[in-house]
């Protein structure tokens, strides 16, 4: 069991990276619906946060079962702070809008990945960095309230897709 959890722990970032490159800025109908729902409904954004947090909780559990240490406790604390929807929403918006914070988060994640006992902190920072790319910015969320676009939903969808990433 321990070997399986270690395999999951080390393959997880590569699976997320492959999914990221397969979906980022693609014109699939799935991505159009995803961007539309993430922009238009709060419940879709909340579901997205729940999926990200459940994967983080699973990865924290995998890290705890394979090699428990203080870094796992700190990663679990960071994940618990993100359980508040307002905090997670704020963090994902800031990382999406401010590219320096996003780059700093991913650089810090790489540093944590290179240190063996800080692998659990890497998972938290890495997931936040990848998830923030697919989270809508404040600019896109303001577009949905534009009175000119309400009459033309297809035009609004094209505008959202153009400015989403």
Residue ranges of each PLM-predicted region?
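Membrane-helix boundary elements
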Residues: 32-69
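Membrane-helix interface and helix-disruption motif detector
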Residues: 1-9, 57-75, 91-96, 111-127
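N-terminal signal-anchor/start-transfer transmembrane helix
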Residues: 6-31
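C-terminal ends of transmembrane helices
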Residues: 23-34, 83-92
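Short, highly charged, low-complexity non-transmembrane loops/tails of multi-pass membrane proteins
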Residues: 140-165
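Hydrophobic alpha-helical transmembrane segments and immediately flanking/interface helices
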Residues: 69-93, 136-146
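Hydrophobic, membrane-inserted alpha-helices
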Residues: 50-60, 79-82, 102-114
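Alpha-helical membrane-associated segments of multi-pass integral membrane proteins
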Residues: 9, 13, 97-149
